[in-house]
Amino acid sequence: MEKILGIDVGTQGVRLVITDDKGNILDEVSREFKFDDGRIEQDPNVWWQSILDCLKNIKTRCDDLVSISVTSTSGTIIPLNSDNKPIHNALMYSDDRSSKEALEIEATMNISMKSSYSLPKMLWFKNNFHEKYKDIDKWVHATDFIIGKLTGVYKITDYTNALKSGFDVSNLAWNDVSKIGLDINNFPKVVEPGTFISFIDPNLSNYLNINNNIQIVAGLTDGCASQFASGAIGLNQWSSTIGTTLVLKGVTKKIISDKIFYSHRHPEGYYMPGGASNIGGDWISKWYRNDELDNLNSYAQEFYPSNDFIYPLLITGERFPFYNSEAKLIDNKNLNKEQKFLAGLEAVGYIEKMAFEKIEKLTGSKIEKIYVAGGSTKSKPWLQIRSSILNKQILITKNPNAAFGAVLIAASKTIYNSLSETFENMVEIKEVIKPDESSVIYQDLYKEYIDWLEVNMNRKDLII
C-alpha cells in the first residue's frame, strides 16, 4: 500500500495527515503553537519543531511513504541568510504594516497589491531593517521553508505562493522588482505545485528512522489546497467556503479580467480565480451562543423560506461580489432571535447567489454544481437553503481541509499522472444536496432582496 503525507502549517498550529492511495486517512496528528500574538510575526523554527514532534508521534508506519507536500498561509514571507537561517521572524499574511509599500508598488509597478501580500512586506523590511536586509540571501514563503527543512533545498517555490510576491501567472515570470529596489537574485525559482524538488534529506530520514527515498514535491497555499480538497479541481468547477467570511474559488480556462478577482495558476495550465466577501458566518458566533445553535437550526429547518431581510455585515465595507467601502450592517429590530437567525442564513445565501451570477456572466459558463466547505457545512438547513437559493446542487467531500489538499498535490505527479486523475481516485463525495420546492420561492425573494439592499445602501449598481 502506497502512502502520502500532507503537512498544513496554519496560523495557530500544524496538522499532518497520512492517507493511502485511495484517499483513506490512516493517521493524523496536530500541534498548536503557543505564540502570545502570532498575527504579525511568528518564529518559523517553532513551526518546524512542531512538525518534527508530529512526525515522531505518527502512529502509522511510514515504510511505504511515497511522497510529501506542504501547504501554508498565503502572503507569509521569511528572510533567510546564506546558511538558510531566518534573520528575522516570518512576516505573517495578517501583518498590515506594509500598507504604504503596497501603494508604492501599485504606483511603480502597475500591478495590484495589498498589505497582506508578501511583496510589500519585503519592501517594508528593507525600509525598516537596513542592516538585516544586507544579510538576506533569499526570500522564502512558509511552504518553502518547511520544504527546505525536509530537503535542504530552499530556493524553489510554486505558482500559488509566488503570486503575492510579484510573480506574473500569465507570463510565468517575475515582474521587474528592481523598480522598487529589490534584488531578483533573492527570489526563488517557480515551479508547478506537485513538481519533484528532492528526496528527503538523508540526515532527517535517519533521525526519524524512515526510508530515504521519499519524494518531496512543491506545495501550494492553504486556500488553494482547501479548494482542491473541497472538490473544485477541474475546469469550470467552483468551491464556496463559508467560515468567518464567504470565499469563492474556481477553475477557468482564461484569466478573469475584473479587479475584484485575483487568479492563481492551476497545475494543469488553467487559472484559479478567487473572490472573498466580508459577509460570512462571523455574525453567528457574535450574536448567538454555541448552545443555542441546535434550536436555531431546528427553527430554520421548519420555517424556511422567510421573507425577512437583513444584511449581517459586522465590519464597514464590502469587497465582493460588489465593492462598497461604506457598506455596513442592515438590521431588522422587529425580528426575534430565531427569525433573525434564519434571515441571516438566507442573506448570506443571497450574496452567494449574487457572486455566482457575476462569475457566470464574466466567464460565460453555466455552473451546475458547487463544492462547499467551512463551518457552514455543519448546519443542515443552511446547506439546503443555499442550494435552493442558488438553484444548484451542493456537494461536500469527505476531507475538505488544507492538509488533505497537500496530500492530493503530493500524489498528483508521484502516484498518479495528474491532479484530475488524483481526484478521481482519492476524493470521495460524502453528500449531495439538491434544490427543493422552496427554490421557486427563493428566486423571487432573491430579486426582492437585491431591490431591498440597493434601497438601503442607496445604490443602483449592485447587479452587473
Model regions and ranges:
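N-terminal glycine/serine-rich phosphate-binding loop of ATP-dependent small-molecule kinases
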Residues: 1-88, 135, 205-218, 390-394, ...
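Active-site core segments that coordinate phosphate-bearing ligands/cofactors
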Residues: 5-6, 99, 103-114, 123-141, ...
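Short beta-strand-loop/turn "lid" adjacent to the catalytic site in phosphate-handling enzymes
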Residues: 56-92, 114, 143, 147-168, ...
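Core-facing hydrophobic residues within beta-strands of well-ordered domains
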Residues: 65, 185-187, 367
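Carbohydrate-associated surface elements
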Residues: 95
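A conserved helix-loop-beta module that forms one wall/lid of the active-site cleft
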Residues: 179-195
